[in-house]
Regions:
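Conserved SAM-binding strand-loop segment of SAM-dependent methyltransferases
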Residues: 37-46
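Acidic-histidine catalytic/liganding microenvironments
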Residues: 13-14, 50-51, 115
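Predominantly a Rossmann-like dinucleotide-binding segment in NAD(P)-dependent oxidoreductases
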Residues: 112-175
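N-terminal Rossmann-like dinucleotide-binding module
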Residues: 1-36
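Short active-site oxyanion
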Residues: 16-20, 54-56, 158-159
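Alpha-helical elements of Rossmann-like donor-binding domains used by nucleotide-donor carbohydrate transfer enzymes
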Residues: 5, 31, 46, 55, ...
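Beta-strand-loop-alpha-helix segment that lines the small-molecule cofactor/substrate pocket
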Residues: 55-62, 66-113
Length: 175
């Protein structure tokens, strides 16, 4: 997610300068270093220690969200955290407590909030053209099989964390 989605977005944004990337997969890391002409690290903590970073994007497997985010906060670095915030509520509360203690900025990325279809639904609901809403239903018309870490409950949280985080967030956002 990070190297294929967030890195191009950072590079194409005039307000950001990509200085380094971290990935334990040496092949992916080497490819990213060559493609984006940046420093690369196989260890996120080493990157945070050696680079002068204002912000890190934590797009690691979900079971690393807590330690990577806490590591950034401890080093005085703000965090843009890929959803879900954590695999468990206790971890999310620990992240929030660390954010409050350190005063660092934290943004949990919920990309579907800013998609055009969501904005259109938001405007329609705000217009009250439909009257009082009693139910919102969201369906998936297709599903992809995950064979990587995201499919495993202990690493990615399984389907609920992959898709459910989007659906629950949208319901909260729209209501």
């Amino acid at each position: 997610m990070g190297l294929n989605y967030h890195v191009p977005a950072i590079i194409n944004h005039p307000g950001f300068l990509l200085t380094a990337v971290a990935d334990p997969d040496v092949q992916k890391l080497q490819s990213a270093k060559e493609k984006y002409q940046v420093k690369g690290y196989t260890d996120a903590y080493v990157m945070m220690d050696q680079e002068a970073l204002d912000l890190v994007v934590v797009a690691s497997p979900h079971n690393f969200h807590l330690p990577h985010t806490l590591g950034a906060f401890e080093r005085g670095i703000d965090v843009f955290l890929e959803k879900p915030m954590a695999n468990h509520m206790a971890e999310a509360l620990e992240i929030k407590a660390a954010q409050e203690k350190t005063g660092r900025k934290l943004m949990v990325y919920q990309p579907q909030r800013v998609m055009p279809d969501t904005e259109a639904v938001r405007q329609l609901l705000d217009s009250q053209l439909l009257g009082k809403i009693y139910m919102i239903k969201r369906t998936m018309s297709s599903f992809f099989v995950r064979t990587n870490w995201k499919a495993y409950l202990n690493q990615g949280g399984g389907t609920l964390n992959i898709h459910g985080a989007h659906y629950i967030d949208l319901l909260l956002h729209l209501t």
